[in-house]
Amino acid sequence: MGVLTLINAVPQILNVSNVAGVQISNVGSEDVTSTILVNLAKEINKVVCGDPTMAGAVVTHGTDTLEESAFFLDATVNCGKPVVVVGAMKPATAISADGPYNLLEAVTVAATPASRNRGAMVVLNDRIASAYYVVKLDANTLDTFKALEMGYLGEMISDKPFYFYPPVTPTGKTAIDISKVTSIPRVDILYSYQDMHNDTLYNAIQSGAKGIMVSLQLGQSGERAAKPDHLDCRCRSRRRLNII
């Protein structure tokens, strides 16, 4: 479904803002690539950040990988204008589909001056969450995007955004300049488990990964038994590789 079709399906949007639709890509979120994300962020930086008449940007996105794209935009959009990522948990053909109302709320948030300087946000199901913290917890319920540690930035009340506190920058947040970036090296993410073998690491390396992030289930007391052996000396020796 193209962006203009989405806009035309919710005419109430025109009561909130003058909307200009731009089609960056039209793929399922499971097929979103780093190249698409780089192009998207550059377009927002150029068209939205560079135009004083633009209040903000709304990105419609499938929910399979929505939080990943939102986090990327949070790190790469270089202005204080709101970038709102929105999706739907029900298909457009479902009874009481949530997509149209979510889109209306997302446009409302993006058009609201109080939304500035909050980074990229995710808006679904009356919730306003920071893209820096939001996670998807359930593939089958409407209220699935959560901000468990930080909490939500706000919520929609009577069709208007209500923020719980003023804008604040998350601790450790880093801005990334992608103005000269054309592609991003492949980085694989591997999850540790009991009896994990180094073969999974070697396969990632042989398949072309330039970096590997290993999610180790470690407590504060120390390492656990499933840590792969000799990560540095055995894997790094195969080729230049970053392992985190």
Segments predicted by a language model, with ranges:
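CN hydrolase (nitrilase-like) catalytic-core segments centered on the catalytic cysteine
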Residues: 213, 219-244
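ATP/NTP phosphate-donor binding region
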Residues: 1-47
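Accessory alpha-helical/coil subdomains and C-terminal extensions
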Residues: 2-13, 130-219, 224
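Short acidic, glycine-rich surface-loop motifs adjacent to enzyme active sites
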Residues: 51-66, 207-219
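Short beta-strand segments
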Residues: 59-61, 84-87, 121-125, 191, ...
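Short coil/turn connectors at secondary-structure junctions
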Residues: 16-17, 52-56, 78-83, 115-119, ...
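Internal gly/pro-rich beta-alpha loop/helix module
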Residues: 85-158
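Short Gly/Thr/Asp-enriched flexible loops that form oxyanion-binding sites at enzyme active sites
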Residues: 59-81, 224-231
